[in-house]
């Protein structure tokens, strides 16, 4: 009989507790148009692959991706429909005057964002 080493965690459990933080409405530095294409590709691929993250949180201009008019709403809604928590920073939504235009997920505050990050097995920052 094989025993799991003390402190070992299964890959599935670790991956299931991954939190992704998206802090911009485009991916990378340089050409803005390319950055928008890349964030669209990233959110599409994220929604299509497994294992899915536990949560995706949107901060700063990243909240534009969860609001009316976003080109990636379909991808983010697919994540939410698959059980991924979608959280947008309330202060950020207020700053960009988007709180009433939120189309997916919930409004979070810095306390809920920090709580999610602290309880995550891994945090991936995009932005």
Question: What is the meaning of each model-derived region?
Answer:
Residues 3-69:
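Conserved mixed alpha/beta catalytic, RNA-binding, or beta-rich assembly cores of soluble enzyme
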Residues 56, 85-86, 123-124:
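Short, well-ordered beta-strand core segments
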Residues 104-112:
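Short acidic-hydrophobic, aromatic-tinged amphipathic segments that line or gate anion-handling sites
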Residues 43, 73-77, 114:
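Short amphipathic alpha-helical segments and helix-helix/interface helices
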Residues 72-98:
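A glycine-rich helix N-cap at a beta->alpha junction
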Residues 110, 117-125:
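C-terminal binding/interaction regions
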